[in-house]
């Protein structure tokens, strides 16, 4: 049985849009496709704009999961965990876990201080499940994310 890796990211220094852009770039550099999940349509629209406006050739091409040609996009923004672009990675940016995300090889779960207790409960649940490899990532004072405990 293969494991799903779930990386927990507590947003404390940088806002979600900055963190999404940094991590999405790394996903693409690794040759992967990505689904960015948020129930909030306004958040999805803002994130799409941020990804496109990265500057020059460094922009991050993306589209909405319900748009034409979604399958061609390296990054999709979606209200759910569907992946018409055949992504094996998902980034949940509204802090609300969805069990459907366990179908991906890897999931990045972002949460803020208000969602810390729910994330801690989820961490404890996953720690008991051999099918899940859960890890915590912490941001240092320079904005670099590092795996921590």
Give the predicted meaning of each segment.
Residues 12, 37-41, 92-96, 111-113:
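Structural motif
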Residues 33-35, 87-90, 105-109:
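Hydrophobic beta-strand segments of well-ordered beta-sheets in folded domains
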Residues 1-45:
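Long, hydrophobic N-terminal alpha-helical segment
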Residues 83-103:
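SF2 helicase motor core recognition
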Residues 43-50, 118:
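Phosphate- and divalent-cation-binding pockets in alpha/beta enzyme and binding domains
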Residues 23-26, 50-55, 107-108, 123-127:
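Short, solvent-exposed amphipathic alpha-helical segments in soluble enzyme
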Residues 105-149:
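Glycine-rich, aromatic-bearing surface loops/beta-hairpins
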Residues 49-88:
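Helix-adjacent hinge/juxtasegments
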């Amino acid at each position: 049985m293969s494991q799903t890796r779930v990386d927990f990211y507590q947003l404390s220094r940088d806002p979600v849009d900055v963190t999404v852009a940094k991590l999405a770039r790394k996903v693409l550099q690794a040759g992967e496709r990505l689904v960015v999940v948020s129930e909030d349509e306004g958040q999805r629209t803002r994130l799409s704009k941020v990804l496109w406006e990265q500057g020059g050739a460094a922009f991050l091409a993306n589209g909405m999961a319900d748009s034409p040609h979604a399958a061609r996009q390296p990054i999709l923004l979606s209200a759910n965990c569907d992946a018409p672009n055949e992504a094996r990675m998902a980034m949940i940016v509204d802090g609300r876990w969805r069990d459907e995300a366990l179908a991906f090889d890897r999931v990045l779960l972002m949460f803020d201080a208000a969602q810390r207790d729910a994330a801690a409960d989820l961490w404890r649940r996953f720690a008991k499940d051999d099918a899940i490899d859960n890890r915590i990532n912490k941001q240092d004072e320079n904005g670099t994310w590092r795996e921590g405990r």
